[in-house]
Amino acid sequence: MPTLQNARGVYLITPDTRDTAQLLACTLPLLPHITWLQYRNKQADAALRLAQATALRAACTAHGVPLIINDDAALAQQVGADGVHLGEDDGEVAAARALLGASAIIGVSCYDEIERARAAAAAGANYVAFGAFFPTATKVTTRRATPALLHEAAALGLPRVAIGGITPSQVPELVTAGADLIAVVSGVYAAADPVAAVQAYRAGFTQ
């Protein structure tokens, strides 16, 4: 199982889009400024997901950025991604590990539940994600995580990801509470200047 103690920074998640050219045009300039990229597209069919994931795999490899596939271990295996992110209904860690191998990065959404994080760690997950910390338009959720949850999860010994409506000004608070990675979608992709936005998120780790 890979060790990710040095994982720190911006965990960028792609938006839902069918425009592959636009997705790549926006994402490529961001790769030098992020730690991980997660491919997530809930609107695309299987063929488009494969095409987009394949293109992003090549781009990430060129920039040395790990690519994580959202919710689909089979797609991760197909494109040679570095890992998979599992939500509540996306299968078990053990099954993903069996498919992707010992070196894969497997993350689990834990929402506002420390017990879910403990179970994920026990099952062999490589990181745990909590959120939403703030209101977000990206995903409808009534679950609200708190900074105290990040602190409590330190005992797991895994990288902790914070997600959900986070702005650059809120990054220092979450990092102080224990977040190793800040996951963001619209805060970067919907910004007038996505590169400046991702740099602002990154700067929050040094404040």
Swiss-Prot record:
Keywords: Magnesium, Metal-binding, Thiamine biosynthesis, Transferase. The keyword RNA-binding does not apply. 4-amino-2-methyl-5-(diphosphooxymethyl)pyrimidine binds at residues 38-42, 70, 109, 139. GO terms for cellular component: cytoplasm. This is Thiamine-phosphate synthase. GO terms for molecular function: magnesium ion binding; thiamine-phosphate diphosphorylase activity. HAMAP family: TMP_synthase. Condenses 4-methyl-5-(beta-hydroxyethyl)thiazole monophosphate (THZ-P) and 2-methyl-4-amino-5-hydroxymethyl pyrimidine pyrophosphate (HMP-PP) to form thiamine monophosphate (TMP). Pathway: Cofactor biosynthesis; thiamine diphosphate biosynthesis; thiamine phosphate from 4-amino-2-methyl-5-diphosphomethylpyrimidine and 4-methyl-5-(2-phosphoethyl)-thiazole: step 1/1. Binds 1 Mg(2+) ion per subunit. It is an enzyme of class 2 (transferase). Its cofactor is Mg(2+). Transmembrane segments: none annotated. Mg(2+) binds at residues 71, 90. It catalyses: 2-[(2R,5Z)-2-carboxy-4-methylthiazol-5(2H)-ylidene]ethyl phosphate + 4-amino-2-methyl-5-(diphosphooxymethyl)pyrimidine + 2 H(+) = thiamine phosphate + CO2 + diphosphate; 2-(2-carboxy-4-methylthiazol-5-yl)ethyl phosphate + 4-amino-2-methyl-5-(diphosphooxymethyl)pyrimidine + 2 H(+) = thiamine phosphate + CO2 + diphosphate; 4-methyl-5-(2-phosphooxyethyl)-thiazole + 4-amino-2-methyl-5-(diphosphooxymethyl)pyrimidine + H(+) = thiamine phosphate + diphosphate. The gene is thiE. Belongs to the thiamine-phosphate synthase family. Its EC number is 2.5.1.3. 2-[(2R,5Z)-2-carboxy-4-methylthiazol-5(2H)-ylidene]ethyl phosphate binds at residues 136-138, 165, 185-186.
